Swiss-Prot record:
Source organism per UniProt: Alkaliphilus oremlandii (strain OhILAs)
GO molecular function terms listed in the Swiss-Prot or TrEMBL record: translation elongation factor activity
UniProt keyword annotation of Cytoplasm present: yes
The entry's keywords: Cytoplasm, Elongation factor, Protein biosynthesis
Superkingdom field: Bacteria
Name under which the protein is recorded: Elongation factor Ts
Signal sequence region: none
């Protein structure tokens, strides 16, 4: 079987091994990619995972407290401890924590949202559109647009970044990955607000945080 340059490139991206080692492994494996990975690992020439598939198990846990009324804990992972100590990475994690305090997302990404919740929201939005007298043939498209808006309201990576609303938190994350040169992942977060779930006088603490961020 002919070993193409694209096959060698793919194996190199998966394993981090040298080009010639990748070509030899593919030749030995008769073009079977999985077997070629095994060959390289047997020879100690392959990392377990690379690039976006690389394991990001280092990183930081950042906390932010706003006036004793809003508290956030967020975990952001990097591949190496070296990057976790990098000031740009630290600043990014801090900005993410402040953004969560200000924008109150419920999930990191849309894949984390319970499908049952999405279906329920679609059902409600469909009924709303029909009650508004919209033709059935355009209701589906309208609901799709409103579901996208729904995701942008509750998913961290899709929210406009508080310090620069022209970019999303996801855009900012992609920019940092490119600049730092390592896979970075916002893994999880928790946000607390005083009196959450208790009926009380309306106070917009999140707006206060957003104003504070804009001043920094």
């Amino acid at each position: 079987m002919d070993i193409t340059a694209s096959m060698v490139k793919e194996l190199r991206e998966k394993t981090g091994a040298g080009m010639m080692d990748c070509k030899k492994a593919l030749t030995e494996a008769e073009g079977n990619m999985d077997r070629a990975v095994e060959v390289l690992r047997e020879r100690g020439l392959a990392a377990v995972a690379k690039k976006s598939g690389r394991i990001a198990a280092e990183g930081l846990v950042e906390s932010y407290i706003h006036g004793g009324r809003i508290g956030v804990i967020v975990e952001v992972n990097s591949e190496t401890d070296f990057v976790a100590k990098n000031q740009e990475f630290k600043d990014f994690v801090k900005d993410v924590a402040l953004h969560i305090a200000a924008s109150n997302p419920q999930y990191v990404r849309r894949e984390d949202v319970d499908p049952a919740l999405v279906e329920k929201e679609k059902e409600i939005l469909t009924k709303q559109a029909l009650n508004e007298g919209k033709p059935e043939k355009i209701v589906e498209k309208m609901v799709e647009g409103r579901i996208d808006k729904f995701y942008k309201e509750i998913c961290l990576l899709e929210q406009p970044f508080v310090k620069d609303p022209d970019v999303t938190v996801g855009d900012l994350l992609t920019e940092k990955i490119s600049k730092i040169g390592e896979n970075i992942s916002i893994r999880r977060f928790t946000r607390y607000e005083v009196g959450e779930g208790i009926e009380k006088k309306e106070e917009n603490f999140a707006e206060e945080v957003a104003k504070q961020m804009a001043q920094n």
